[in-house]
Amino acid sequence: MAHKKGTGSTRNGRDSNAQRLGVKRYGGQVVRAGNILVRQRGTKFHPGNNVGIGSDDTLFALIDGVVMFERKGKTRKKVSVYLPLTAVETAPAEAVAS
């Protein structure tokens, strides 16, 4: 027989790190090319105009612009990046005058 009581093991004692998923840039925010827009598991949000998708379903901006969240059909959502309206609307005064 053992002279000392053996210590019992426990099956607890682990805690994994958070995955930090979710929307990282919201609608109307200005983003640079390469900025991560959404980190997700599966395609809760689908890529729209000027948005790429990574191997882990992360959505990222392909151009500098403004983020827009839109509907894609009845049930799906998509994220797009468009050029800011101010850059398109405001032209140099010399170009307008001539």
From Swiss-Prot:
Q: Name one GO molecular function term.
A: structural constituent of ribosome
Keyword Acyltransferase tagged: no
**One Gene Ontology biological process:** translation
Q: Which Pfam families match?
A: Ribosomal_L27
Sequence segments annotated as region (Disordered): 1-22
Q: Which SUPFAM superfamilies does this one have? A: Ribosomal L27 protein-like
Q: In this UniProt entry, which cysteines form S-S bonds? A: none
What keywords sit in the KW lines?
Ribonucleoprotein, Ribosomal protein
Stretches of Polar residues bias are at 7-19
At the top level, the lineage of the source is Bacteria
A single GO CC term for this protein reads: cytosolic large ribosomal subunit
Q: Which family does it belong to?
A: Belongs to the bacterial ribosomal protein bL27 family.
Q: Which HAMAP family does this UniProt record tie to the protein?
A: Ribosomal_bL27
Q: What is this protein called?
A: Large ribosomal subunit protein bL27
- Which source organism does the UniProt entry give? Nostoc punctiforme (strain ATCC 29133 / PCC 73102)
